[in-house]
Amino acid sequence: MESGPSSHLDWARSLEAVLSDRTALDLFQKWLMEYSLPQYLDLYFAIRAFERMTLEGKPEKNQLSKSIYCKFLSSRTGNCEAIPKHFKAPIGEKIRHGIDLEDRAFSHCSSFVVDFLRRQHEEFVRSDEFIEALNKVRLRPLFPKPTVILQMSSSTDSSSSHQNTIRKSGSSKRTATQLTAEALLKTKHDRHTKFGELKLEKMYPSARQPYVCNATTSHNDSAVSSSFSGDAPGAHRSNRLRHLREEQAHQNRDTATVPRVEKQQASSAADQPFDHATENGRRGFSMEITKKLLRHLDKVKMNEEMERRIDDIEECRYTTIDMVNGTEADVDMGGIDEDEELDDYLKMKMTDDSQKGSQNRSPKGPNSGEKEKDGVSKNATFSPAPPPPRDSPRGLISSHLHHHSIHHNTIRPPRRTSKEYPLDISLSRNQYPRHHQIDTNRSLMSQSMCVPGPSYSSASSTFSRDSFAPSPMLKGFAGAPGSSKSSQMYDSSGIGSMAPSAFSATSSLDYKEKRHRKSLPNHHSMMSNSLTTPRKHHKIGKSLSNLITLSYVGSDKIPVVTHVPYDGPMTLAEFKRHFALPTGGQQLFFKTDCEDGSAPFQLLLVRDEHTLLPVFEGRIAAEIR
């Protein structure tokens, strides 16, 4: 170590001062072995030795270069992995081919190592080991100087508050102080008042030569601090702060400040925290907090809206097709089947009408001559006998019309045009009574649509007040005109037994129609679609276990879900019809099991309208892109 008085202070200023001083170098190497990588320090001195041998022309330089490469730079045996490969590759090529290296062969590696050691030096001078070693060197001067000790008295006399005593050391060799627990307790007050806080003592251990200073602590630190401040009651002009500072500077001439190497980190204004001490800083902080809160509120509102839409979709368990088929009407009416309710009503009405005497008497029958002799001809009603079975519906219709041909003049003419009730029968239209025309139309229409006709579509609603009830037809031919539930519920052959009147039937139909119209959201659309869509006569409770979930996610990332009856595999056209999606312009990707098992699922693009869709986890899920 150099003999200069402040050589140890240069250790913190530069790396070169540490590398040129043996004491600092040993300390730096010890710190590297404990906290970092010491091999880069060895490489630095090995490169310096190679350069010196090259300048002196020694033949040992080739062997040294091989050793440096094998120990530090080789990709297999080297331990300096941080050096870039493009610095090490040219050196390895020359050594493998036996080419002598030039003087500056390791210059690039040397510059990289120096930069690395310089960064390590910045951390080293901040460590506790360096500060402790620096204090030890400071406490061992080569030429001891007289010590100045300021004895601080606890007496209340202000004139003797600061008394200086000078002691000269008789020998240059000092004995180490025994820091026992008792000695530390005795000097605790002096150490606290001299150095202020315990953090300072931890960073800088107490010196063997007491430092002359004045207690400049706050008024609230301790009770004894007031006796060392200029505001004490017994203080006078000679003990002012300026006088004490001058005395300290005069008595402590060899005091030097320990340099601190702080790395300056460039930071932008955006990285700086808000200055709450200024109005602008507080305003900026409040604006930033307001923006974050608004973004959070927007997210909360969006999540609530999404949950509300999902709940609405879950509540709507059936699609528009189910509503057209009458499922929603059954739900609104309490789950009562419409046909069963109508049948019960007709039975009750027919029972009431059969118990009353008929006010409308029909004309005389073909056998009225025999009954007039018995005196019963005035109240007799005409009831045609059932016709014999025929092979075709045309024979049944013609036979049925033949029995009623004598009453053709008593039937009201039809009020509707031929456009409303087109018939496919080749017989003449004016050969039929009105109720046979309408009943035949409804039966044929029901056959063409494969839908059973409603129970009130025959005798109970088609004949007028002055007409007769149709004759009961055979059960074997369900498609004959006039064959329905109500036509077989009563017997028209007895005296006093009458079918329901036209007025009662039409009034019950009007009541039922009004009630049914109120229960449906769109009566006109249902009536128009009922001619093309088969009507489902099933209870809702029976179909809940046979439902499948359909869903898709659109471009707005909002899922749309529906539950439909599952009757088998579904095509792409049926899937689009359930959601009323357009036929073209959109690509549907359906979830299916992953083929290679690398993902939970995969997306399958389906374009053909007749392709069967895959079922993934019990549902058919799609994404529109």
From Swiss-Prot:
InterPro entries with a match to the protein in the record: Axin-like, DIX, DIX_dom_sf, RGS, RGS_sf, RGS_subdomain_2, Ubiquitin-like_domsf
Ranges for region Disordered: 153-177, 218-237, 247-283, 350-397, 507-536
Every DIX domain range: 544-625
Phylogenetic placement of the source organism: Eukaryota, Metazoa, Ecdysozoa, Nematoda, Chromadorea
Record's keyword annotation contains Flavoprotein: no
Polar residues bias spans: 162-177, 218-229
Name assigned to this protein: Axin-like protein pry-1
Alphabetized GO MF terms: beta-catenin binding; molecular adaptor activity; protein kinase binding; ubiquitin protein ligase binding
Family annotation (Gene3D superfamilies): 2.40.240.130, Regulator of G-protein Signalling 4, domain 2
Function: Works in parallel with axl-1 in negatively regulating bar-1 signaling in vulval precursor cells and Q neuroblasts. Inhibits Wnt signaling, which affects tissue specific expression of Hox genes, egl-5, lin-39 and mab-5. This in turn affects QR (postembryonic neuroblast) cell migration, vulval cell fate specification, and the development of sensory structures by the seam cell lineage. Has a role in alae V cell patterning, ray formation in the male tail and axon guidance. Does not affect B cell polarity.
Domain RGS: 14-135
